[in-house]
């Protein structure tokens, strides 16, 4: 029902006729509307050839509990996962943009040892191919295919007494997404920019040793198989003035679950021995929103501040994440 509702809402937003708008003299021009972009849903537009986008994000994932297998909230110790990610993109041609997205992080846990220092997370390579271009007065949105390859550069196992040092997944993850973006003129003549994205990601098997981000302990030897992830994103940005924009994301994600297989080292007996170990996380889902406000100094430089909140879910963490970013296009 949730997926159906999101898809229906996004379809209405993308293909709603441009009726009931203000008189042409009051109609905001596209050049007058400056955007930073919402927090979660990435854009469908590609950069003009030869141009560069730099957009660093900083955030604090505050986790105070989780949603159990029945979707009920269960509280736990508070964990702060401070992090940053930076989009570094380049317009190779007008319809093809490529780049890299590095991440860094630090975990401040409620009990136990914090991260030993700021660490490198996984790095993502991105290629974006534009399929169509929005034209004012038309019904076709800007759309693009986005291919991402995440490289396991972050530490994820052999964490010793500091599980909080785990900032990566250890897996090569491939994601394919379809992004779309459309513009609507509201009755007062102001522009509402909408986005609807759908993505699917799959990861390879990961060799795991000792304490890891997968919950294994010292002495473990085996593999983890992260589950596939399906995601839906929808976003709305309302141009209050050419500088100020109100933004809202709504998103849904479903994970098919992680399987762990291997052996644990048991040392309680006279002779240490290895015993089989297996665990399955089970499938999970989460639904969240991310309200935000943007301020744009020019059409090429702007900032956004907002909060991402996981409002519901099953077998997943319950977190709220303050986020800030600056968007710069050269």
What are these regions (language model features)?
Residues 56-60, 100-104, 145-151, 194-202, ...:
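Transmembrane beta-barrel strands of outer-membrane/channel proteins
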